[in-house]
């Protein structure tokens, strides 16, 4: 879907979901709001600033208030109006010549307020081909309303460069309460 954006704060909002990338290489063309548009073709996704040479450079940001402490790496966060128990995430690379800039390793965090985070998963060794998604499973039984994906390494092993993703999908189950039945949720 289409997010309403605030370029000054790098914040995007749609139907109660709030998405915030840690940086953007080109805020007008690759701000990150297209990570949730269901399209992984060329020209759709998010590019971070130049923060990698295989692994994250010391100049890369760090997700604050994480337990255990988050590693250095560009990150994206999403806040939802409802808590879910996350079962897994799927990420796809930017398409075309950008598949080598996709996440190769990283960590997943959950939170309740968008300010404090708990590690709930990790991944490594990812490679990609055009149109391919990689899945990251989580084992947490806790329901969270906020999630973060921290990228610690990219697939490009030759050049210092930015990180790019074409699509970020989250799958889980809504918290049961107030007379509601649990339902599958996809963001």
Question: Where do the model's predicted regions map?
Answer:
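Short linear Ser/Thr-Pro motifs
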Residues: 18, 22-27, 111
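Aromatic, loop-rich ligand-recognition surfaces of beta-strand-rich domains
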Residues: 1-7, 29-32, 37-121, 130-182
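Residue-level structural signal for beta-strand termini and adjacent loop
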Residues: 123-125
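Polysaccharide-binding surfaces and accessory modules of carbohydrate-active proteins
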Residues: 10
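Low-complexity/repetitive intrinsically disordered segments
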Residues: 183-187
